[in-house]
Amino acid sequence: MNKQVIEVLNKQVADWSVLFTKLHNFHWYVKGPQFFTLHEKFEELYTESATHIDEIAERILAIGGKPVATMKEYLEISSIQEAAYGETAEGMVEAIMKDYEMMLVELKKGMEIAQNSDDEMTSDLLLGIYTELEKHAWMLRAFLNQ
């Protein structure tokens, strides 16, 4: 068991768990002309988040670690900030885009740590998530005309 790899993975579990809640918040509270589009998109993204949480937590268990599993732990180690009430639809999209861009940096570092630890399976798991996030970040930037 490599403690650095476990830390990287637990940070991802925490990030995805906070993001899961944030995406639900946005799914429920989005308003305006893009309601139907964003309501559906946020649901797609939180469903994907749930898959990542499970895959990463199971990887932690497979390599002998213990995944974080409480809201307290998530909030202590996550880089993701909870959603603020009163966000505009565009503000919601921008917040998620920024979260994804930050997570891309963390995933890249995590892949490097896993590779340096000869843990190709973890690196591959993180690469798959990275690829999905990179596409989502691009689409969110396009939505915002950035």
Swiss-Prot record:
Stored PROSITE patterns: DPS_1, DPS_2
Superkingdom in the source lineage: Bacteria
Keyword field: Cytoplasm, Iron, Iron storage, Metal-binding, Oxidoreductase
UniProt xrefs under Gene3D superfamilies: 1.20.1260.10
Keyword Transferase applies: no
GO molecular function: ferric iron binding; oxidoreductase activity, acting on metal ions
Enzymatic reactions: 2 Fe(2+) + H2O2 + 2 H(+) = 2 Fe(3+) + 2 H2O
Residues that, per the record, bind Fe cation 2: 58
EC number: 1.16.-.-
One GO cellular component term noted in the UniProt record for this chain: cytoplasm
Subcellular location: Cytoplasm
Any one biological process term the GO annotation gives: intracellular iron ion homeostasis
Binding residues annotated for Fe cation 1, in chain numbering: 27, 54, 58
Pfam families named in the record: Ferritin
Biological role stated in the UniProt entry: Protects DNA from oxidative damage by sequestering intracellular Fe(2+) ion and storing it in the form of Fe(3+) oxyhydroxide mineral. One hydrogen peroxide oxidizes two Fe(2+) ions, which prevents hydroxyl radical production by the Fenton reaction. It is capable of binding and sequestering Fe(2+) ion. Does not bind DNA.
Subunit structure, interactors included: The 12 subunits form a hollow sphere into which the mineral iron core of up to 500 Fe(3+) can be deposited. Homododecamer.
Family classification: Belongs to the Dps family.
The record's note on its domains: 12 di-nuclear ferroxidase centers are located at the interfaces between subunits related by 2-fold symmetry axes.
UniProt-recorded name of the protein: DNA protection during starvation protein 2
Organism listed in the record: Bacillus anthracis
